[in-house]
């Protein structure tokens, strides 16, 4: 089961699991449309089932609803925590929708690690909401493109969901020294590989798989991903 770190904050408020469930139930009771997806996910995290249901994006086939074990979410958190050196009390900000895995995992990371998470309504243009320093944020390339002048406030910025174009990369690196491009999918509980992109690199650096992840190609030249800590089955894409 998922245990909340005592340092966890959501929008500047401390919550334990009971308080978070109460918060979610209240939002559903009053039909707070902006928080319904968040609230439903909170209730799912703390129910008695060992899994959550998550909708895939369709990158590995037809979009579908799959089961992800809660232990897999925890293992995914640990991979991210170790790679980006996330610690209790660090600040984070997210504008990702809570009905897909990337948004869900931002909350799970915050709860488990003990981050101070500023969770905002999903928007393609989050620029006006970034007005102070944050240690960690995950964005789509479009969100980053529309927030170019505010990226300096984010220490560790990860971009995923689609490829970062060369022009966008140049624009980002004109404002900050480093960002991280990620590769992953719903079936792997978000990213399993990361590429560090820095203005100081003379050549482009490749993606590197996270600890415990292995990749190969099959006879059809399809990518085969093995992440035993997240899923028992190999993923072919």
Task: For the regions a language model picked out, list residue spans one by one.
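Gly/Ser/Thr-rich phosphate-binding loop
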Residues: 147-201
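Conserved AMP-binding A3 loop
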Residues: 51-78, 85
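Conserved pre-ATP/AMP-binding loop-to-beta segment of ANL
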Residues: 37-55, 88-90
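Conserved ATP-dependent adenylate/AMP-binding module captured primarily in the ANL superfamily
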Residues: 1-31, 74-96, 123-135
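AMP-binding/adenylate-forming
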Residues: 69-75, 91-146
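Conserved S/T- and glycine-rich ATP-binding loop of Class I adenylate-forming
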Residues: 56-59, 92, 107, 137, ...
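Conserved ATP-binding loop and adjacent catalytic segment of the adenylate-forming AMP-binding
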Residues: 178-220, 229-234
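Alpha-helix/helix-capping structural signal
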Residues: 71, 142, 162-163, 229
